[in-house]
From Swiss-Prot:
It is found in: Nucleus. One of its GO terms (molecular function) is RNA polymerase II cis-regulatory region sequence-specific DNA binding. The keyword Mitochondrion does not apply. GO terms for biological process: cell differentiation. It comes from the Eukaryota. Coiled coil: none annotated. This is Mating-type M-specific polypeptide Mc.
């Protein structure tokens, strides 16, 4: 193949980048994730029905404003849900956005009780798992006296007041149930 080929527009395009010495590597998306995380690469998601055109930096003159060699693509925006994004990338992207947007709920009386009792149960019984701990804590909560329960309800009211000061516009909005297939 010639290193230059004429297009109908009459401008030469170099195909030197097709030379085997050019750093053309096949990457699995999962393998490329490290390069993306370290800032040595970028991820671009291509929706169904589109084909990406990759041009090495040495050929970037093809994209300058005066060049009529390639058709100019029109910008189209897609949501992540419209793109076929590998789950491990999508999960980390959603995790990053949710962590800044989501406001935590204030703990209720049982949650405060469970948090305190969970650690003590695990210390006294290191071989039990979380589901067993949950069952035991639930039983313990039901058997607690009114005075003990009142103490946790008062603690939860304190945390609720603190929460209102920190997040004045907060309103709990439960997730809608997804329809099971």
């Amino acid at each position: 193949m010639d290193s230059h080929q004429e297009l109908s527009a009459g401008s030469p395009i170099s195909y030197d980048f097709l030379d085997p010495d050019w750093c053309f590597k096949r990457y699995l998306t999962k393998d490329a994730l490290h390069s993306i995380e370290t800032g040595k690469g970028a991820a671009y998601f291509v929706p169904d029905g589109f084909t990406p055109i990759l041009i090495p930096n040495s050929q970037s003159y093809l994209l300058d404003g005066n060049s009529a060699q390639l058709p100019r693509p029109q910008p189209i925006s897609f949501t992540l849900d419209q793109c076929k994004v590998p789950g491990y990338i999508l999960k980390s992207l959603r995790k990053d956005t949710k962590s800044t947007e989501r406001t935590p709920r204030p703990p209720n009386a049982f949650i405060l009780y469970r948090k305190e009792k969970h650690a003590t149960l695990l210390k006294s019984n290191p071989s039990i798992n979380n589901s067993q701990v949950s069952k035991l804590v639930g039983e313990m909560w039901r058997n607690e006296s009114k005075e003990v329960r009142m103490r946790y309800f008062k603690m939860s009211e304190f945390y609720k007041a603190q929460h209102q000061k920190m997040y004045p516009g907060y309103k709990y909005q439960p997730r809608k149930n997804k329809v099971k297939r």
